[in-house]
Amino acid sequence: MLRLGGAGLVRGLRVVSPAWLRGPGGLPLALARTTGTSGARDRRAPASGTQRGRALSLSAAAVVNSAPRPLQPYLRLMRLDKPIGTWLLYLPCTWSIGLAADPGCFPDWYMLSLFGTGAILMRGAGCTINDMWDRDFDKKVERTANRPIAAGDISAFQSFVFLGAQLTLALGVLLHLNYYSIAMGAASLLLVVTYPLMKRVTFWPQLALGLTFNWGALLGWSAVKGSCDPAVCLPLYFSGVMWTLIYDTIYAHQDKKDDALIGLKSTALLFRENTKQWLSGFGVAMVGALSLVGASSGQTLPYYAAVAAVGAHLAHQIYTVDIHRAEDCWEKFTSNRTVGLLLFLGIVLGNLYKDKPDETKGVDAVGEESERTS
């Protein structure tokens, strides 16, 4: 047995570290940091000299952590380490693009990729605007105190320049669409800029977020078809807003104590112990609106099966969520990616199940008409 300066005891090849070198859960501090069990502040600590002991990970957080150090604060400002927000912004776009596809056909893959790129950029821009508005509040909330602007990793001027770069790239994506869609996309910028202020003036900032995050339900259809069909797009947009009210109210319960102390408002603080009743109402409204979308767009059995699965998933979320446990709220919040993907899959399969237009009938009709006139 060899003693190493009080730092640990070596028995064979095993190192036993003393308590002051141990992190959360009793893990050695270095291991705790690499496995993600340390606090949020450890994320900003310099990495140890070698990375050889770390397991290879392709998670979004691992990719951000492996980026050049000067870039990391900007990637975190865009929330690239937490891609769930990008998914929740992108999925309503996929629903709309899928519904706009011709019967018997897959969605337009070019549009899906274009909107995916736009979702990454606009979610990043939205987070940048949010953190610029909220930097003083973020410092007072435990969960947000280490965001790059609040922590001082990025200055106000740097964040403004970075915002301009993101919006410029997003404009480049938007210019690939038709004029109608360009105008619609530009109109959404007002919602993007004003949403972060809503938590200061109303208990319904989640409604403002829903109006913002589900704009793609309108834009996706118009990008494919050239304009919006109100019979399909409006109930689809409404269903997305109801969905956002569900998942973002659950999300807001993570910060309700801090929000109440610093004077910020949310539906979590408004609904309190009646949260599950409100969320149940939003869930019923969402499923009802999706059923109307199906009827208006001539959807088939796979679509309605997916709507039923969405309803079941939401019911499970609402019934089982513990609004007083931040960890459970986060878990339920992130599970909403599955909700969106289920619906998209149902739209695609429902559309493939439709009969393709019989082009030969049109050709035969033209031939018969020409014979009668000759």
From Swiss-Prot:
Segments on the Mitochondrial intermembrane side according to the record's topology features: 105-108, 175-176, 222-230, 299-300, 354-374
Catalytic activity, EC: 2.5.1.39
Cofactor(s) needed for function: Mg(2+)
Pfam families referenced in this protein's UniProt entry, alphabetically: UbiA (PF01040)
EC supergroup of this enzyme: transferase
GO biological processes: glycerol metabolic process; isoprenoid biosynthetic process; ubiquinone biosynthetic process
Side Mitochondrial matrix, residues: 64-83, 130-153, 198-200, 252-277, 322-332
Compartment(s) of residence: Mitochondrion inner membrane
Example GO molecular function: 4-hydroxybenzoate polyprenyltransferase activity
Location (main, coarse): mitochondrion
Gene3D superfamilies: UbiA prenyltransferase (1.20.120.1780)
PROSITE patterns named in the record: UBIA
InterPro entries assigned to the protein according to its UniProt record, in alphabetical order: HB_polyprenyltransferase-like (IPR006370), Prenyltransferase (IPR039653), UbiA_prenyltransferase (IPR000537), UbiA_prenylTrfase_CS (IPR030470), UbiA_sf (IPR044878)
UniProt keyword list: Isoprene biosynthesis, Membrane, Mitochondrion, Mitochondrion inner membrane, Transferase, Transit peptide, Transmembrane, Transmembrane helix, Ubiquinone biosynthesis
Transmembrane segments: 84-104, 109-129, 154-174, 177-197, 201-221, 231-251, 278-298, 301-321, 333-353
Membrane association type: Multi-pass membrane protein
Transit peptide: 1-63
Keyword Transmembrane recorded: yes
Pathway, per record: Cofactor biosynthesis; ubiquinone biosynthesis
GO cellular component annotations of the record: mitochondrial inner membrane
HAMAP family: UbiA
Family the UniProt entry places it in: Belongs to the UbiA prenyltransferase family.
Function: Mediates the second step in the final reaction sequence of coenzyme Q (CoQ) biosynthesis. Catalyzes the prenylation of para-hydroxybenzoate (PHB) with an all-trans polyprenyl group (such as all-trans-nonaprenyl diphosphate). The length of the polyprenyl side chain varies depending on the species, in humans, the side chain is comprised of 10 isoprenyls producing CoQ10 (also known as ubiquinone), whereas rodents predominantly generate CoQ9. However, this specificity is not complete, human tissues have low amounts of CoQ9 and rodent organs contain some CoQ10.
Protein name as annotated: 4-hydroxybenzoate polyprenyltransferase, mitochondrial
Source organism of the structure: Rattus norvegicus (Rat)
Source organism phylogeny: Eukaryota, Metazoa, Chordata, Craniata, Vertebrata
